[in-house]
Amino acid sequence: MAKITKTFQYGKHTVTLETGEVARQASGAVIVKMDDTVLLVTVVAAKTAREGQDFFPLTVDYQEKFYAGGRIPGSFFKREGRATEKETLISRLIDRPIRPLFPEDYKNEVQIIAMVMSLDPEIDGDIPAMIGASAALSLAGIPFKGPIGAAKVGYNDGQYILNPTVSELKKSQLELVVAGTANAVLMVESEAALLSEEVMLGAVIFGHREMQKVIQVIDSLTAEAGTEPSDWVPPAKNDALVIALKEVIGGRLSDAFHIREKLQRRDAIAAVKDDVIQQLAGRLEVEGWNLAELLKEFGELEYRTMRDALLDTKVRIDGRSLEAVRPITVKVGVLPRVHGSGLFTRGETQAIVVTTLGTARDGQVIDAVTGEYKENFLFHYNFPPYSVGECGRFGVQKRREIGHGRLARRGVLAVMPSLDEFPYTIRVVSEITESNGSSSMASVCGSSLALMDAGVPVKAPVAGIAMGLVKEGERFVVLSDILGDEDHLGDMDFKVAGTSEGVSALQMDIKIEGITEEIMRQALQQAKVGRLHILGEMDKALAAPRAELSDYAPRLLTIKIHPDKIRDVIGKGGSTIQAITKDTGTQIDIQDDGTIVIASVNNAAAREAKRRIEQITSDVEPGRIYEGKVAKIMDFGAFVTILPGKDGLVHVSQISSERVERVGDKLKEGDVVRVKVLEVDKQGRIRLSIKAVEEEVASI
């Protein structure tokens, strides 16, 4: 295939798609250029599915090459290693809108690799990667119901910004990524500075409208490339098996979905499934049916039973109305020795969240393609297998945990104090101890409580809620505070976090087309009502940050010195600073601009360290009387230390009003004496006098 190039303007940026020259053995390959950011995105699809494959094995890997930014990796091996958190998040960002566009029965392995090969510091690789994945899939000749478009939306001064630069995002009140087909929004990921629901919805609509240009260009690219449509044919539906299943199941699935407790409901459905397998085991061999086919059709009946009951009765699995939030219990200060903690329980979803305060040196150093930087607000989300009553691997962080942790972090970021306001490194850890839907939003609520319990001056409490949707034709219901089954069997997962004033984070994943603006508006308004209810419940436990930090949290004292005096505080070979930290038990951080932060759990120790630093850095004042220690005896006088690192000379003539023959007759090394500063000359030499102090005292 000859090289094909398509170029178009996308916001302020020029985007180019190229295919036919590089990676020609892949099923589909595209080079995407957005100004100076360049990615190679490839798709390889297996010709057939593995035997017995019962899920769609789609993998997406996004990688930023260090050479893209003109850097060599800082690791020991000097090469790219396992995926960073950013790479994992962008891999998920690519995956989420494309996965629903493959047929349910398609089980062939598909791998997407997006490599950033040149990186403009002002243009991140996420949007080009999503565009490239869409184009490469469209060229691959597989049953992909795309293409999709993707756009990033900023918001400043009442105006939406299409694909803002990194610099523009720093000033923006919004960072929102939206992806979808020509007719439908499929995915939204965002963080916001407490914006209204209308502004958030407007950003989604704006982004979807602008991305139409991307979809048109990809359609043009695939048409010119002459991509043959996929010859994959879905397996024929086994009507006889479906009839047999329905006869054996009867009304038992419907009865199981009336059980309100999750584990009992799960066990009841499993019992029905086991009985069905046992009853139909003989017919499987006779009719030529296979077990995988039976289990698939059983799952389809599960799906249909729950959805039909919900649409017909407007009553949910656990007996709630559509808008009702599950019962909430809130506790704070649940762990005695930590700096802040909260226990948030909503129905059968529960999180213990802990806040730890540290100093600036506890921040995480990130070795990124664009250079090193330090992260001082860390949020970690853990989802152990026991939280859903299962056995499984423990301690290995999965992509889902990274994604949920980042969403929860976005939820509280808008209310966090700046480093100038609260100069601590803050780590929040959410331990999910029970899960039946919306554990990431429980983490938002729990983190808000733990932060306030730790005394972090957040601007306002934050709560989060997950919304769902069940839609059949023109009939639909929007669900507040969804259960795990409602998420799994529903058409939308719509998470909203924020304060009473506005939205701080919005995440949406939609499995179907036909989600209208009106449905999204209803979901946002219903989420607001639920969020305010949850905030009210949280306020009963703790409505504002505690006035005092935990007794076990470090206290920080900050002082500012002239940068020229930093070397005095450090001392030769670090001797001075080491002595202070050892004597006082404090931790001291010195910045290049002269800012010194002293950290200690003991207030008195921190104050002593501060006093000693102020002594070292203070200037000697002529005319002032100091108490000093005799450091050295000379024939012509004595050197007296009046401040750390500052010695002055008391000439023999200034030791006493009487004549002094030998200095040693009056002074000895180690003597503590009071001296007056007579002069500090241009070379910084200090002249002192004991005699002047005696005369001054005598004159009073």
Swiss-Prot record:
It catalyses: RNA(n+1) + phosphate = RNA(n) + a ribonucleoside 5'-diphosphate. The keyword DNA-binding does not apply. Residues 623-691 form the S1 motif domain. Its cofactor is Mg(2+). SMART domains: KH, S1. One of its GO terms (molecular function) is 3'-5'-RNA exonuclease activity. GO terms for biological process: mRNA catabolic process; RNA processing. Involved in mRNA degradation. Catalyzes the phosphorolysis of single-stranded polyribonucleotides processively in the 3'- to 5'-direction. Belongs to the polyribonucleotide nucleotidyltransferase family. PANTHER family: POLYRIBONUCLEOTIDE NUCLEOTIDYLTRANSFERASE, POLYRIBONUCLEOTIDE NUCLEOTIDYLTRANSFERASE 1, MITOCHONDRIAL. This is Polyribonucleotide nucleotidyltransferase. The gene is pnp.
